[in-house]
Amino acid sequence: MKIETLSSLAKIYPDRDLDSKYFQKEGCMLQNEAFSFQAAFKLDDNDTQIKTAIGCKIDIPDELKPYTRVKAIDYVPCDYTLYPSSLALSDHPEPGLFPDILRDIPTIFWAYSNSWRGIFITVDAQNALLTPGTYTIKISFKQSRTYTKEFRIEVLEATLPKQSIPVTNWFHTDCLCNYYNVEFNSAEYWRITENFAKAAVHYGVNMLLMPVFTPPLDTAVGGERRTIQLIDVYKDGDKYSFGFKKLRKWVKMCKRAGVEYYEVSHLFTQWGCKYAPKVMATENGEYKRIFGWDTNGHGSEYLGFLEQLLPELITELKKLGIFKKCYFHVSDEPTAEMKGDYSICAKFLRQYVSPDRIFDALSDISFYKEGLISCPVVGLDHVHRFIEEKVPTIWGYYCCGHDMTSNRFLALPAGQNRMLGLQLYKFNIKGFLQWGFNFYNSHMSLEQIDPYGSSTGGGWVPGGDAFVVYPGADGNPVISIRLEVFREALQDMRALEALEAKYSAKMSKKKAHKEIISKLGLDEMTFLKFNCDGKYLVELREKINRLLTE
């Protein structure tokens, strides 16, 4: 039997040989972070068997044992890998099975003669403080005899600081209701939602989308997504009253999960504010929709409703102690043609919310120049225009259209996911957004999809764009390799911040930042020009760790 240990950035495909540049026998980590590596295995080339059942045993030192998780790597089909412009970047541009799902170790493990399989091992000490030293993890597979491989981890005497920026991956609880067949606001809804929220926070997603009304996102005009509405609305003519019991429950759940920032869902429809989101209300004892696609988003009826809601909502958020950690949306991804409508709605919202707490995904800098937004969330392919204009508060985002920037598509090299942390640090980006933590719908939410059967939203987007967790048994999330790597990117950013804090003891913060960029050879790196080679990124992180402890 063959066994190879590899970095977390390797891809163990069932129909490809291993890339030796990812082979890794040892690594180093800080005392309070997560460190992952992989072990791949297959039968010897001269083995006469096609496949055989094997035993798997991992010997873990006592110091690491409470924090070490071993998962079997499973595969998800991808029928739409990348756009033609980025196919050359991929080591598997064809449709096929892609390693992503991290399952519990099965009762029976199979080894094959013609296919590599693997396990993913994580020492997850982010809520601990490991004792510095060198530890050896021994991986054993038993066939007719036992085959072993060792991996050494050196824990260095240094720690990561707390994550400094808000990070959101949009959190779609209607998709959880659909998959698990539970009703909104049921006991099961809250249990499952909290499980997924805890997973989000654990992996660096410290801001959660808060559905005050059903988020008007990725919904066909005239269509509806399942109602998820935290505010109860009571209508009496043109007067409204509100109940915040569900909202309070949401905030308590978020606090238990460790959420730090709250992203109030969009108050106007996507792509330009033309309509109101779906709002359900009780009127004369009947629960019904009162606003939606047939409602002018900046007409007097809907704005009059918001004039009554927003003061009460803000008072409630202040009572809950979270208003200063709340961010508000107008409309997602408005274009220049929609600027007039966006202007009306943005100016309206600014009567109630400070401009620095209003943020939207957009890439047209004229919205900023004309004073319509102070906190733009910019597509990574457009960020440098905003940097050149010296915009003080820039967030970044990527989605299906960003294949030549950092992204997490299944068919892109894992390094293209991992390098994000270096870029966020170098360019002082204040926050990061991605649209799909767990979006299990098709294009425009016309259908529900099974994420285990389709990674592409039913063929709509490149595989991996719409979600980074899978719905597991008993309402628990199943983590993806891509989410593990995304967390590593955020840890890289935090390690650089720790190094900057160290250097700042002897020089200004600005000079320390410049010194680090130069010392690491990152002067030429931009959001569009980068080295995402996995071996390079692993070695670069080790260099950062050594600089921290020298």
Question: Which role does the model predict for each range below?
Answer:
Residues 276, 294-302, 306-337, 348-362, ...:
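Catalytic domains of carbohydrate-active enzymes that cleave complex glycans
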